[in-house]
Curated annotation (Swiss-Prot):
Region of interest: Leucine repeat I (LRI): 102-165
Keywords: Nucleus, Transcription, Transcription regulation
Lineage per the UniProt record: Eukaryota, Viridiplantae, Streptophyta, Embryophyta, Tracheophyta
Region of interest (SAW), ranges: 403-477
Signal peptide extent: none
GO MF term (any one): DNA-binding transcription factor activity
Protein's UniProt keywords contain Cytoplasm: no
A Pfam family it matches: GRAS
Species whose genome carries this gene: Arabidopsis thaliana (Mouse-ear cress)
Compartments, record wording: Nucleus
Domain of life: Eukaryota
Record PROSITE patterns: GRAS
Protein name, UniProt field: Scarecrow-like protein 26
Length: 483
C-alpha cells in the first residue's frame, strides 16, 4: 500500500485537535514524548519532511496485499467504525467522522510500516505516534477513535521495548487481577466471542465420552478453567451412560511463562476441585509442569481404561501466547495417546509466515474493528461498563497481539493452517453434531443479529461478525482411534 507524499503529510495537519499538543509515550531514544513541544503546522511538518527525505523510500513500502480474507471487501465497512480500506482509501467527500477514521487508519498503517522492515525508522515512528496520540484517546466518542487509541498505545509499547538505550524504562500496564476478571466476565456477557469456543468444545466432549466410565482431559492452556465447571454440571445431570463418570483433568504449565502462571494453574485446580465436591462429581486434578516448551507424554500420569481428550485453546483472550513449536510438540505427542477427541479453538487472525508485518497488522486491525463494531451493536460507548472492559481488558489484548505479530517470520504461522496440520499428521476430522450446531446458534440468539455461525467443513464451526470470521472450533481424533 503506497502513500502519496502530499496526502501522507496532509494526514497530520487536520483541524480536529489543538495544534499545540503532546503525546504521552516514551520514545526509542530514551526521552518522553511529553517533552515535545510541537507546533503541528510548522515544526512537525519540517520534522516529517526531514525524516522522509533522509529515509528515501520510507513511504514506499514493499508491495503487500492488504488482507482480503473470507471474501471480505475492505478492512471494515461499518458506519460506527468509519473504517473502509481495500488497497487504498477513497478521498471523496466522506462525513467528518469517516474522514477522521480514514486518516487514523493511514496513520496507524504508516506507523506500523515505519516501525518494521528494511527501511524502519524509529524517529519517523515516534513522530507518527505522537500525532496519533494527539488525535485520539481511549475515551473518544467513536469506535474508530477508541480503537486507534489502543493500537497507538500498543505500537508505542513496541517502540519502547525495542529501545536499546532505555529498556529498563518500559512498563506494561498492570491492572488488579480482580478488575481483569471482572472485565473478562463483562465481555462474556457482551459478546459470544469467548463462550462460543467453550460451548462447542464442551458439547463435543460430552458426545465423545458419553459411554465412558473414566475421562481424562489434557488441557494445553487451562487458564481459569471456565469451561470445566459447565462440563461437570452436564456430567452430573445427564440421564444416559454411566451414572458416575470420573473426570480427571491434567493442566499443563510451562516454566517459560513464569511463576505467576504456575501459581494460577494451581489455584484453578483448587477451585475446580471445590466445585466438583459441591455438586458430587468424582474428580481429580493434576498439574503437569514443563521445564521447556517441549511436551512429552512421559510427564503425564496415565490410567488404563481412561478415554483421553485433548483440549487445545490457542491465543484466545486471557490465554498465554505459545509458540508454534510448542503447539506442534504438544499435538505430536498427544497423538501417541490415541485421543478419543481433540478440540481445537483459535482466533481467525491471519498470521501467514510468508506475509510481512504490514499484512498481519492490517488483518489484526480488521479483526478488532469487527469486535468493536459487535460490542457497539449491543452496548453503546456511553455505557461505563464498555469503557471499563476496553481499558482493562481489550487494550492489553490488542497490545499482546501486536507483540505476537512482530515475531520473526519463522515463528509466525497462520492459525488457519492448524486444521490442515492435524489432518496431515495422523488425525482425522470428527463431524460436528446437529446438537452442537443448534447450541451454537442458540448462543448467538442471545446477542445481536450481526453474529453468525458458519460450518467449516464437516468438523468445524466458525463464529463471525457480519463478513468477518472471528473464532473457529474444529474437532479431531487420532487415526488409530476406533469411534
Amino acid at each position: 500500500m503506497n502513500y502519496p507524499y502530499e496526502d501522507f503529510l496532509d494526514l497530520f495537519f487536520s483541524t480536529h485537535t489543538d495544534p499545540l499538543a503532546t503525546a504521552a509515550s516514551t520514545s526509542s531514544n530514551g526521552y518522553s514524548l511529553n517533552d515535545l513541544d510541537i507546533d503541528w503546522d510548522c515544526d512537525f511538518r519540517d520534522v516529517i519532511e526531514s525524516i522522509m527525505g533522509d529515509e528515501g523510500a520510507m513511504m514506499e513500502p514493499e508491495s503487500e496485499a492488504v488482507p482480503m480474507l473470507h471474501d471480505q471487501e475492505g478492512l471494515c465497512n461499518s458506519a460506527s467504525t468509519g473504517l473502509s480500506v481495500a488497497d487504498g482509501v477513497s478521498f471523496g467527500e466522506p462525513k467528518t467522522d469517516e474522514s477522521k477514521g480514514l486518516r487514523l487508519v493511514h496513520l496507524l498503517v504508516a506507523a506500523a510500516d515505519a516501525s518494521t522492515g528494511a527501511n524502519k525508522s524509529r524517529e519517523l515512528t515516534r513522530v507518527i505516534l505522537a500525532r496519533l496520540k494527539d488525535l485520539v484517546s481511549p475515551g473518544d466518542r467513536t469506535n474508530m477513535e477508541r480503537l486507534a487509541a489502543h493500537f497507538t498505545n500498543g505500537l508505542s509499547k513496541l517502540l519502547e521495548r525495542d529501545s536499546v538505550l532505555c529498556p529498563q524504562q518500559h512498563r506494561d500496564d498492570v491492572y488488579d487481577q480482580a478488575d481483569v476478571i471482572s472485565a473478562f466476565e463483562l465481555l462474556q456477557n457482551m459478546s459470544p466471542y469467548v463462550n462460543f469456543g467453550y460451548l462447542t468444545a464442551t458439547q463435543a466432549i460430552l458426545e465423545a465420552v458419553k459411554y465412558e466410565r473414566r475421562i481424562h482431559i489434557v488441557d494445553y492452556d487451562i487458564n481459569e478453567g471456565v469451561q470445566w465447571a459447565s462440563l461437570m454440571q452436564a456430567l452430573v445431570s445427564r440421564n444416559t451412560g454411566p451414572s458416575a463418570q470420573h473426570l480427571r483433568i491434567t493442566a499443563l504449565s510451562r516454566a517459560t511463562n513464569g511463576k505467576k502462571s504456575v501459581a494460577a494453574v494451581q489455584e484453578t485446580g483448587r477451585r475446580l476441585t471445590a466445585f466438583a465436591d459441591s455438586i458430587g462429581q468424582p474428580f481429580s486434578y493434576q498439574h503437569c509442569k514443563l521445564d521447556t516448551n517441549a511436551f512429552s507424554t512421559s510427564s503425564l500420569k496415565l490410567v488404563r481404561g481412561e478415554a483421553v481428550v485433548i483440549n487445545c485453546m490457542l491465543h484466545l483472550p486471557r490465554f498465554s501466547h505459545q509458540t508454534p513449536s510448542s503447539v506442534i510438540s504438544f499435538l505430536s505427542e498427544a497423538k501417541t495417546l490415541n485421543p478419543k477427541l481433540v478440540t481445537l479453538v483459535h482466533e481467525e487472525v491471519g498470521l501467514m509466515g510468508n506475509q510481512g508485518f504490514l499484512y498481519r497488522f492490517m488483518d489484526l486491525l480488521h479483526q478488532f474493528s469487527a469486535i468493536f463494531d459487535s460490542l457497539e451493536a449491543g452496548l453503546s460507548i456511553a455505557n461505563p461498563a464498555r469503557g471499563f472492559v476496553e481499558r482493562v481488558f481489550i487494550g492489553p489484548w490488542v497490545a499482546n497481539w501486536l507483540t505476537r505479530i512482530t515475531a520473526n517470520d519463522a515463528e509466525v504461522e497462520s492459525f488457519a493452517s492448524w486444521p490442515q496440520w492435524l489432518e496431515t499428521n495422523g488425525f482425522k476430522p470428527l463431524e460436528v453434531s446437529f446438537t452442537n450446531r443448534c447450541q451454537a446458534k442458540l448462543l448467538l440468539s442471545l446477542f445481536n443479529d450481526g453474529f453468525r455461525v458458519e460450518e467449516l467443513g464437516q468438523n468445524g464451526l466458525v463464529l463471525g461478525w457480519k463478513s468477518r470470521r472471528l473464532v473457529s472450533a474444529s474437532f479431531w481424533a487420532s487415526c488409530q482411534t476406533n469411534q
